[in-house]
């Protein structure tokens, strides 16, 4: 049987994963549970791992995976039609095996170059290359890939050199990580926050400031659904 805080954290992580495709940062979990420090989150995650409810994948972006939920939480779990995917082991070997067994197991996405997870860069207009990924990594819809440049999203598990898989779209919910086009010139990867008639682009690194714009100056170009990291 889980404690109240363990139950709250597990349900929060599950809902965040299903809504955004990414596990929440420790700061987000701390705020969601109204705890004073991140050490409490570490203890709760450790307890959930020991009891077989949660798995933490070391050295991987967005490294939390919900293995199961308590029966009461599972019954109330909304059917969003989206389930996050985690790449395990050697990516290249698995993908080659998948292609040999089933050509439909891999899809090709346009790679539009580097996007700033630091200071915004000039908007990317033409794709420079292509990337092949497991089809199971993404859900329905049109997708593209961007290489992350910079460290402003490190607390969200997004590192310099990661490949971000983006679901193309012009809308996103507040709190989701999006590709934002500013003034039709700059493009950046940040967490979106709606603030009345303004839009805030929020980094996940205390070294960077939140940027706030009139809503009409920011256009959503898609939202983050997965990350791919090479070792």
Curated annotation (Swiss-Prot):
InterPro entries registered for this protein in UniProt: LexA, LexA-like, LexA/Signal_pep-like_sf, LexA_DNA-bd_dom, LexA_repressor, Peptidase_S24_LexA, Peptidase_S24_S26A/B/C, WH-like_DNA-bd_sf
Entry keywords, A to Z: Autocatalytic cleavage, DNA damage, DNA repair, DNA replication, DNA-binding, Hydrolase, Repressor, SOS response, Transcription, Transcription regulation
Highest taxon of source: Bacteria
Active-site residues, Swiss-Prot/TrEMBL: 152 (for autocatalytic cleavage activity), 190 (for autocatalytic cleavage activity)
Start-end of DNA-binding region: 26-46
Catalytic activity entry: Hydrolysis of Ala-|-Gly bond in repressor LexA
Gene Ontology biological-process annotations: DNA repair; DNA replication; negative regulation of DNA-templated transcription; proteolysis; SOS response
SUPFAM superfamilies in the cross-refs: LexA/Signal peptidase, Winged helix' DNA-binding domain
MF terms in GO: DNA binding; serine-type endopeptidase activity
Enzyme class: hydrolase
Site residues, Cleavage: 117-118
EC number: 3.4.21.88
Entry function: Represses a number of genes involved in the response to DNA damage (SOS response), including recA and lexA. In the presence of single-stranded DNA, RecA interacts with LexA causing an autocatalytic cleavage which disrupts the DNA-binding part of LexA, leading to derepression of the SOS regulon and eventually DNA repair.
Family: Belongs to the peptidase S24 family.
Subunit text: Homodimer.
Entry protein name: LexA repressor
Gene that this polypeptide is encoded by: lexA
